[in-house]
């Protein structure tokens, strides 16, 4: 169908659209015709500003309807919302928008109900009734979105300085996920984090429930041990596994770490470095394996000896 888009200069643009087109699609068509970037466009119909993720039919826009195109409102700005999966969502907001408004925009774009959203900025959880300007959130600021899923719980992470960090987690979260949450809150790279609970160092590929970590449990966060280093293990499929090790770790220890991450029993693993097969009882330093060295993992097929 055809619709019309009228600009403030009085110009009328004719567009070919489908009722199922999103507002985002329409803005892209306007960009193609007129060269106006979508992030500078606001479309108004029946007195309402149209949200990118909605469709024309959602707004009952029919053939030969006229939309009004205005420039971004004064004070309008873009902010970014980053999810734990690494996806970044771009939102058009005003400094006077409440956190509740922002959650509604996220719901429009991503379908996540506001009551499952927690927004974090500068390490603080944002309260619904406050505005972006209350928190000094400015253009191109990045908020972090964490989901309050059913079964969610709080745990505490205590640092060596005595600071306690509160995290929203699921029993099914891996230690790797928890390290990503700490990075979001505190800026500490995951490869510098080691978690201790009940006297044990926690392995990245395991879950909180594997370690019987329950609501309001306290983990201890320590920096990588002196001498700690990363090495890489490359499989025949081309996958590369990153491991945290010590030079004093035995090949047996390394195989146990690979089992934790990948589920491959140690007796099916053969590790090769510099053309040599590594023996279980030897250490990494025996073989002069240093930080960021790459080992090759080959599987010992059934029937092999």
Curated annotation (Swiss-Prot):
Pfam families in UniProt: ubiquitin (PF00240)
Residues modified to Phosphoserine: 65, 141
One of the protein's GO biological processes: modification-dependent protein catabolic process
Marked site: Interacts with activating enzyme: 54, 72
Glycyl lysine isopeptide (Lys-Gly) (interchain with G-Cter in ubiquitin) cross-link, chain position(s): 6, 11, 27, 29, 33, 48, 63
Ubiquitin-like domain: residues covered: 1-76, 77-152, 153-228, 229-304
UniProt site positions, description: Essential for function: 68
Propeptide: 305
GO MF assignments: protein tag activity; ubiquitin protein ligase binding
UniProt keyword Protease present: no
Database matches in CDD domains: Ubl_ubiquitin
Covalent cross-link Glycyl lysine isopeptide (Gly-Lys) (interchain with K-? in acceptor proteins) as placed by the record, residue numbers: 76
Keywords: ADP-ribosylation, Cytoplasm, Isopeptide bond, Membrane, Mitochondrion, Mitochondrion outer membrane, Nucleus, Phosphoprotein, Repeat, Ubl conjugation
UniProt similarity note: Belongs to the ubiquitin family.
Oligomer and partners: Interacts with SKP1-KMD2A and SKP1-KMD2B complexes.
Protein name (Swiss-Prot/TrEMBL): Polyubiquitin-B
Species per Swiss-Prot/TrEMBL record: Equus caballus
């Amino acid at each position: 169908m055809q619709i019309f888009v009228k600009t403030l200069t009085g110009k009328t643009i004719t567009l070919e659209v489908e009722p199922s087109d999103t507002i985002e699609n329409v803005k892209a068509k306007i960009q193609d015709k007129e060269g106006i970037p979508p992030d500078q466009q606001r479309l108004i119909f029946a007195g309402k500003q149209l949200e990118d993720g909605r469709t024309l039919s959602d707004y009952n826009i029919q053939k030969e309807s006229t939309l009004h195109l205005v420039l971004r409102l004064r004070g309008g700005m873009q902010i970014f919302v980053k999810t734990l999966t690494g996806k970044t969502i771009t939102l058009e907001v005003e400094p006077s928008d409440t956190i509740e408004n922002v959650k509604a925009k996220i719901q429009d774009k991503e379908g996540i109900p506001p009551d499952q959203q927690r927004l974090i900025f500068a390490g603080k959880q944002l309260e619904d009734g406050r505005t972006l300007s209350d928190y000094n959130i400015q253009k191109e600021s990045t908020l972090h979105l964490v989901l309050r899923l059913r079964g969610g719980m709080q745990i505490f992470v205590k640092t060596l300085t005595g600071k306690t960090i509160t995290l929203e987690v699921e029993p099914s979260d891996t230690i790797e996920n928890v390290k990503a949450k700490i990075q979001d809150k505190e800026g500490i790279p995951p490869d510098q984090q080691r978690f201790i609970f009940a006297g044990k160092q926690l392995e990245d590929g395991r879950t909180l429930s594997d370690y019987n970590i329950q609501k309001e449990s306290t983990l201890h966060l320590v920096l990588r041990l002196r001498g700690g280093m990363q090495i890489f293990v490359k499989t025949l499929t081309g996958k590369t596994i990153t491991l945290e090790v010590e030079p004093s770790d035995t090949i047996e220890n390394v195989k146990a770490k690979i089992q934790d991450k990948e589920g491959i029993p140690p007796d099916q693993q053969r590790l090769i470095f510099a053309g040599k097969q590594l023996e279980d009882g030897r250490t990494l330093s025996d073989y002069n394996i240093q930080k960021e060295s790459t080992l090759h993992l080959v599987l010992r097929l059934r029937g092999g000896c």
